[in-house]
């Protein structure tokens, strides 16, 4: 038998299946989807079995094939569906197969490779060095570097006293805990008869034999009052043994979830629910765009359709942007479906995430709630896929391998013949245009549940505030509104849009701004560490006391970060309890949930935060939302800037007045006449959509045209320019005259990490030769560009244009 294996080497030259002989003793356990250890050149590496055949390819010499060394899994980590998906993504998006397979799996099961020196001749190794080798005769390269032993080891390598080895290790470790069990082979009644005179041992054995189906930990026995001597006595007699029991890492093990019953649907909700249910029952693929205003009850529609899926014996997947994966959202699912829910997001440890993933693979969890990468959850019988806040750009992975969760969800829904729901209060233009064309089925929820009115939205022109002498970041209206809520003991949410509005240092005399020496961007000031940092390459420095350019002492922080706003708020409202939510305050595990719980309990009056407070908050006492700087995103060099401003402001505004108490939203802006801000005030998505579509049509942008962005980078400007011209020429040769090939031109961020960046943007409607052109460029890059250390990034359907 032959296994066709994709090896764990991220190189274009080995991006195909290698044939390996399956040893006879492994034939019964090796199947597609399992991980195996195989010899590859001089190394031993991990691979994934893609298929099993009786015979190798005709042109191969069987005598030269190597054997699989070891199989890592009892059952496959990859389903046959995920294998097919990786093949499809590899061929349509020009992604290496191994890169696609690894993004599908939890990081805990990815192989780690450690470079080491292996002792060959112990006698010849100097005694001072000998003690640094472990019991297996290895001295790891990293340790040798730390200890300054590399030079000596390289000499020993040359003299054939040591050899270089690459050691394969696993990230994954099972969590275990000491437990106790009865030894099989004895009849309990016979043992108990022998223990009648030793009462405590009798009681302990009786308990253990009755609870054989359960895992009994040592700590459980101690808690029940059984003594150590009683246990030791039973072990000595050979009736009981200690062992290491595998413990599942459940991030919610200490939580009790009250069961939640389904809510009565409104007429609009019921219509949407019925349309989706029909496709669940008939097992047909259809994409629904659920367009509902904030607070219209989209989540309840999701929950009730999932109930129908589970009643049919099928499974459901719910995707939520990482930023909106709030404890409140998880709580609703856990209350409705209990242990049937697995949660997958970056806040979990590697072990917790792997155990949640295994629950899905083994069929113990039938519902997943997770961020972007959970779209690859190993369900075998999907009945529904939901993408909440479908407009979010974070559903596109910006790093290699680049993929969009929506596209993966569509592929999987076709594979399983099940519907997809794309839900949003502010759908992306591409999705709404598809719904208008009939490609998607549009479902509308135009009203909030319980006849609750949408909040009143007021726009404050900050230019007028400035002309009236108010240089503060709080307008007169916002100040008064905050004070009113504090007097009424109601809660306030204040949103600071940090995108394009970070704090930096500025010399008031000459205008000097400290720049990153490696990137074309100003350094951001962080008050907690009192450092200037670059968010692109990680460079940091101490803020100068005087200007390096003109030696003036008038150099200070400009722009307002959340910490500065918190200080100003505390000065304005001395008695207010302020909870700040940003990257700094939520970096520790569980901090996000802890802060929100405090606010929900009423232990905070004002919640101040960045984008992470824009979604998912549904608290009855929030009656005021203030947007401190509405238009900073409008100034970004991106054709989606207006759309993202509209979406973000609408989402933030939706946090106010969701229950009995009426809500108010105050938006502070220097662009009060901009259509994206005016349409938020009117809560008029369709007017915004029509206006923005006109601009997209004029500019030949999506949804009228598709885009591909090519970014070429290198440390030398001359090489970047030459390579960019070459890429441009290749594209013109392969594409028709209808395609627009723009550039090459410097990227908006023209230098990052000391590398110059040029971009070529292709706009097209239908290009039969496009895939061939991308394939040709990818091949050309691996043949020519890599040698020159040139980087080529091919971004299909780019979400970020910087």
Label for each model-derived stretch:
Residues 734-747, 786-797:
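Short beta-strand elements
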Residues 685-687, 692-693, 731-733, 767, ...:
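Surface-exposed amphipathic alpha-helical segments in non-transmembrane regions
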Residues 8, 129-131, 697-702, 747-752:
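Short, flexible, solvent-exposed loop/turn segments with mixed acidic/basic and small polar residues
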Residues 1-368, 375-408, 414-424, 438-452, ...:
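Accessory, non-ATPase domains that flank or precede helicase/AAA+ motor cores in DNA-metabolism machines
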Residues 87-90, 479, 566, 570, ...:
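Generic solvent-exposed, charged/amphipathic alpha-helical segments
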Residues 35-37, 44, 743-768:
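Short, intrinsically disordered low-complexity segments
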Residues 260-266, 270, 283-721, 760, ...:
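Inter-lobe coupling/hinge segments of SF2-like helicase ATPases
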Residues 683-686, 721-742:
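Short amphipathic alpha-helix segments
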């Amino acid at each position: 038998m032959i296994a066709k294996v994709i090896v764990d080497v991220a190189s274009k030259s080995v991006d195909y299946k290698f044939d390996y002989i399956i040893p006879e003793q492994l034939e019964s356990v090796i199947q597609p989807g399992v991980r195996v250890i195989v010899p590859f050149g001089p190394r031993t590496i991990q691979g994934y079995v893609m298929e099993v055949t009786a015979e190798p390819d005709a042109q191969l010499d069987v005598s030269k094939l190597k054997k699989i060394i070891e199989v890592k899994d009892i059952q496959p980590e990859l389903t046959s569906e995920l294998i097919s998906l990786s093949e499809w993504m590899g061929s349509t998006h020009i992604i290496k197969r191994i890169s696609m397979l690894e993004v599908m799996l939890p990081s805990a099961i990815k192989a780690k490779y450690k470079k080491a020196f292996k002792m060959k001749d112990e006698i010849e190794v100097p005694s001072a060095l000998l003690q640094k080798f472990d019991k297996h005769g290895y001295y790891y390269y990293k340790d040798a570097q730390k200890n300054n032993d590399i030079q000596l080891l390289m000499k020993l390598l040359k003299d054939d006293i040591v050899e270089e080895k690459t050691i394969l290790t696993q990230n994954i470790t099972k969590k275990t805990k000491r437990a106790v069990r009865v030894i099989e082979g004895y009849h309990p009644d016979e043992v108990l008869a022998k223990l009648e005179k030793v009462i405590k041992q009798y009681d302990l054995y009786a308990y253990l034999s009755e609870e054989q189906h359960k895992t009994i930990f040592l700590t459980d026995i101690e808690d029940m009052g059984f003594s150590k001597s009683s246990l030791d006595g039973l072990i000595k007699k050979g009736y009981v043994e200690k062992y290491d029991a595998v413990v599942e890492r459940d991030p919610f093990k200490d939580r009790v979830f009250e069961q939640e019953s389904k809510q009565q649907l409104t007429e609009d909700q019921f219509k949407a629910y019925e349309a989706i249910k029909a496709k669940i029952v008939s097992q047909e693929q259809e994409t629904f765009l659920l367009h509902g205003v904030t607070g219209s009850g989209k989540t309840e529609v999701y929950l009730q359709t999932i109930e129908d899926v589970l009643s049919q014996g099928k499974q459901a997947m719910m995707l939520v942007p990482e930023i909106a994966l709030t404890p409140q959202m998880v709580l609703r699912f856990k209350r409705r479906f209990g242990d049937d829910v697995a949660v997958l997001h970056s806040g979990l440890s590697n072990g917790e995430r792997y155990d949640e993933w295994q629950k899905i693979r083994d069929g113990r969890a039938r519902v997943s709630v997770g961020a972007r990468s959970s779209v690859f959850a190993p369900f075998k019988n999907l009945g529904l896929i939901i993408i909440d806040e479908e407009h979010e750009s974070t559903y596109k992975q910006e790093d290699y391998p680049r993929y969009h969760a929506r596209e993966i969800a569509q592929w999987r829904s076709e594979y399983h013949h099940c519907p997809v729901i794309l839900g949003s209060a502010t759908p992306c233009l591409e999705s709404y245009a598809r719904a208008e064309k009939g490609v998607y089925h549009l479902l509308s929820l135009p009203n909030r549940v319980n006849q609750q009115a949408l909040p009143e939205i007021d726009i404050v022109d900050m230019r007028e505030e400035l002309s009236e002498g108010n240089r503060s970041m709080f307008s007169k209206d916002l100040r008064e509104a905050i004070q009113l809520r504090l007097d009424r003991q109601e809660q306030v949410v204040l949103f600071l849009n940090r995108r394009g509005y970070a704090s930096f240092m500025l010399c008031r005399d000459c205008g000097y701004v400290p720049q990153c020496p490696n990137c074309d961007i100003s350094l951001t000031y962080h008050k907690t560490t009192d450092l200037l940092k670059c968010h692109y390459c990680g460079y940091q420095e101490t803020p100068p006391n005087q200007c390096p350019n003109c030696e003036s002492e008038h150099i200070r922080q400009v722009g307002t970060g959340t910490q500065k706003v918190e200080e100003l708020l505390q000065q304005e409202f001395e008695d207010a309890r302020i909870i700040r939510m940003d990257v700094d305050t939520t970096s520790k595990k569980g901090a996000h949930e802890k802060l929100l719980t405090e606010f929900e309990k009423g232990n905070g009056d004002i919640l101040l935060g960045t984008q992470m407070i824009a979604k998912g908050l549904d608290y009855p006492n929030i009656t005021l939302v203030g947007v401190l700087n509405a238009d900073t995103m409008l100034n970004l060099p991106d054709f989606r800037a207006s759309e993202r401003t509209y979406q973000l402001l609408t989402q933030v505004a939706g946090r106010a007045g969701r229950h009995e108490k009426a809500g108010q939203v105050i938006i502070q802006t220097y662009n009060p006449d901009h259509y994206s801000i005016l349409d938020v005030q009117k809560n008029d998505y369709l007017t915004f959509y029509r206006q923005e579509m006109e601009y997209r049509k004029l500019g030949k942008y999506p949804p009228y045209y598709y885009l591909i962005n090519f970014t070429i980078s290198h440390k030398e400007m001359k090489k970047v320019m030459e390579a960019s011209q070459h890429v441009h020429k290749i594209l013109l040769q392969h594409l028709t005259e209808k395609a627009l090939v723009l550039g090459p031109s410097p990227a908006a961020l023209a230098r990052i990490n000391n590398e110059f960046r040029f971009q070529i943007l292709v706009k097209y409607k239908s290009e039969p030769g496009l895939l061939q052109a991308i394939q040709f460029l990818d091949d050309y890059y691996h043949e020519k560009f890599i040698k020159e250390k040139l980087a080529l990034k091919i971004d299909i359907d780019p979400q970020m244009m910087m």
